[in-house]
Amino acid sequence: MARVKRGVTSHAKHKKVLKQARGFYGRRKNTIRTAKAAVDRSKQYAYRDRKVNKRNFRALWIQRINAAVREHGLTYGRFIDGLTKAGIEVDRKVLSDMAIHETEAFGALVAASKKALEYLKDAGTKNEFEAAVN
């Protein structure tokens, strides 16, 4: 059986790591030992931050919705409560976009939310509200 030297595979692995480390500062971009550690760490940060990114965007959407709803005399929590009681299921991303670009439609949602809150405060049951709306 022929002798197998592993220079080709290790060189390919090193090239792969160094390619991923392009753009790094200092020895991290061209020394395999530091580049490998930096690439591993960068992948951990990327994995973590993909989740953090979702949290940050949800918080941004909520802030935008809250600001737009307060112009109509409601708070964010009351608005969402009213939408839930009215049976309107719109996610926060769409609500945020509507608040910025489609203010009339967003105003209609705020009115529906207020109506649901007022009606349920007076009547008390959700079924009566749905019967009155439909």
Swiss-Prot record:
Gene Ontology CC entries for this record: ribonucleoprotein complex; ribosome
GO molecular function terms attached to this record: rRNA binding; structural constituent of ribosome
PROSITE patterns per UniProt: RIBOSOMAL_L20
Pfam families with a match to the protein in the record: Ribosomal_L20
Top-level lineage group: Bacteria
GO biological process annotation, one example: translation
UniProt KW rRNA-binding keyword: yes
Keywords for this protein: Ribonucleoprotein, Ribosomal protein, RNA-binding, rRNA-binding
UniProt keyword Secreted, yes or no: no
Task performed by this protein: Binds directly to 23S ribosomal RNA and is necessary for the in vitro assembly process of the 50S ribosomal subunit. It is not involved in the protein synthesizing functions of that subunit.
NCBIfam families: rplT_bact
Entry's family note: Belongs to the bacterial ribosomal protein bL20 family.
Name of the protein: Large ribosomal subunit protein bL20
Organism: Rhizobium rhizogenes (strain K84 / ATCC BAA-868) (Agrobacterium radiobacter)
Annotated gene: rplT
